[in-house]
Amino acid sequence: MTAATAPITVALPRGDVRVSAVHEAPVAPWAALALAHGAGAGLDHPFLVGCAAALRAEGIATLRFAFPYAEARRRMPGPAAHAIATWAAVMARLGETASGLPLVAAGKSYGGRMASMAAAEGVIDPAALVYLGYPLHPPGDPAKARTAHLPAIAQPQLFLAGTKDPFLQPLTQFEAAVATCRDAEIAWIDGGGHSFEVKGRTRAPETVGAELAPDVAAWLRGRLIPSR
């Protein structure tokens, strides 16, 4: 495995900022995936680290990175435009390091939603997008759905979703939103919450993240590798 920790420069209205990034690749990867953290976590959160390690075991190179607000150690995300600009810089870096591999944009909760907005605006053009717990709406407030942009995304999308996720209730609303997408699937995690925790099961965050990787890899193989 190869690893690099070179920061990424992001162009923001107030000037360029540098964000931390960790690129790790297995021997002979068949895809490269940028993995964004959620709003309340960082690039080194155990869930994200575990998921990335398991993806590499599946043959996928990974690039974990920080959004500018997290790099500045602020708790609340900045403007969406800053996150979208970060996604643009991250995918450019991933393309430089991936040697012609298919590029995938993925993220936990907020990080995935920002990837979807960047794709909908044409700022990034990944081969596919993967959402780990897409935040359909704030918990208990389904009237504030964050889905109007999803039909504009041309790329295939995979939504990994817990059936007990409070950000997705009622599930019928989430299913209806995904049905408006051009090309999208839901992979349900039975009993899973927003971070895919399951009541009555004690698992470390690294393990929870790692257990999602086989579903992600299988879906990506079906979408990115031509059948013979």
Residue ranges and their predicted role:
Residues 87-155:
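Primarily recognizes the serine-hydrolase "nucleophile elbow" in alpha/beta-hydrolase
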Residues 153-154, 159-161, 165:
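Short beta-strand/loop motif that positions the catalytic acidic residue
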Residues 192, 200-228:
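Catalytic active-site module of serine/aspartate enzymes centered on a nucleophile-bearing elbow/loop
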Residues 179-197:
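Catalytic histidine neighborhood in serine/cysteine hydrolases
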Residues 164-168, 194-195:
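Acidic catalytic loop of the alpha/beta-hydrolase fold
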